[in-house]
Amino acid sequence: MKVDIHARRFKLTEALRHAVHREITRLVQGVGAGITRVSVRLFDVNGLRGGPDKGCLVHAQFTDGSSIVGSDVDDDLYRSVPVAFEKVLRSRRMDRARRHTLRRHHPGAWPNPA
């Protein structure tokens, strides 16, 4: 799995990098194998002016060809990171449940995941 973490308009600290890696571990444990790439963008829209403008955008790509994007903006980046990852995890679970239901009720309607 490839992991790509970038911070825009500020320096990526070791604590933030650790927080992102912790969430990547939770994501892998939550969806199992099948993640090929995770790109994380951390950003601060207003820079030093402050405000609820710090955000995290997560783009996860999977072996079945699908990809999911989750994002969150908050005044605290350490709160934004887990929320964005949780959105990706929740979307992946809903997608897998939807595919499972389609295969069960309409065999052949949805290609089997790789």
Each model region followed by its residue ranges:
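N-terminal, polar/charged subdomain of small-to-medium soluble alpha/beta proteins
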Residues: 1-114
